[in-house]
Amino acid sequence: MSAKLINGKEIAAQVRQQVAAGVEARKQKGLRAPGLAVVLVGHDPASQVYVGNKRKACEQAGILSLSYDLPEDTSQAALEALVDELNENPAVDGILVQLPLPSHLDADPILVKIRPDKDVDGFHPYNIGRLMQRKPTLRPCTPAGVITLLDSIGTPYKGQHAVIVGASNIVGRPMSMELLLKGATTTVCHRFTDNLEKFVGEADILVAAVGKPGIIKGEWVKPGATVIDVGINRMDDGKLCGDVDFDAAAERAAYITPVPGGVGPMTIATLLENTLYAANVLHADT
């Protein structure tokens, strides 16, 4: 392997230490700890693991973690009422509703109901609009975390061709806006893109966010490229792998993120950053 690994665990640990220092600085000034309300509906095993990790990270950083574990049969009205209650709670700086929700619930009205200044996931149309207008406040966690990874290796964005594979609302679309803000020339590939290999081969910065193991062949990667693999796919043998053929891509890339241990830890670290930002900037008077 010739590529240098971008160690998301180490970089995320640094971010979390910075957040913990920021929380401690608030306390030294006599201010309350930031508060994050995490709402889990049902008993999806993967969601329970994700939520547990987020709550643990909050506690380690000194952020107040407020847990709301609701039964599988929770109604739309009951969930919306809880969001309304959390919106008005001055101890809550951030509200996170863990997705996916059970099939009988509609996530869109829930996410829109979260107050934009408490939308620490960065999914609210207001916050996406701010990002589009080049005035971001609370940024979507995974794309913002990717930028932190790229910054850590001194990525020269201007003049670089960034190719994002995947056009989801959570990663692909806001990722394109983040890279545009940095000055990169940005291309988004999706399921209707012809000749994916061509675009991948032109990428100085490649971000793969599809959710299909090995969809990006290693031999497609441009020599010297930076490869960010957002995909997390569990194989039949229980192992995790990304969207990129890691071993082959690592022979051509200059930098590459592993799966696991690359982008995943940054998502939670950025969630903590957003929660502290909401407390310090958006709720400075509470």
Swiss-Prot record:
Tell me which Gene3D superfamilies the record gives: Leucine Dehydrogenase, chain A, domain 1 (3.40.50.10860), NAD(P)-binding Rossmann-like Domain (3.40.50.720)
Q: Which UniProt keywords apply?
A: Amino-acid biosynthesis, Histidine biosynthesis, Hydrolase, Methionine biosynthesis, Multifunctional enzyme, NADP, One-carbon metabolism, Oxidoreductase, Purine biosynthesis
BP GO terms, sorted = L-histidine biosynthetic process; methionine biosynthetic process; purine nucleotide biosynthetic process; tetrahydrofolate interconversion
Cross-referenced NCBIfam families: PRK10792.1, PRK14186.1
Which family does the UniProt entry place this protein in?
Belongs to the tetrahydrofolate dehydrogenase/cyclohydrolase family.
Function according to Swiss-Prot or TrEMBL: Catalyzes the oxidation of 5,10-methylenetetrahydrofolate to 5,10-methenyltetrahydrofolate and then the hydrolysis of 5,10-methenyltetrahydrofolate to 10-formyltetrahydrofolate.
Name of the protein this chain belongs to: Bifunctional protein FolD
Q: Which organism is it from?
A: Marinobacter nauticus (strain ATCC 700491 / DSM 11845 / VT8)
Q: From which lineage does this chain's organism come?
A: Bacteria, Pseudomonadati, Pseudomonadota, Gammaproteobacteria, Pseudomonadales
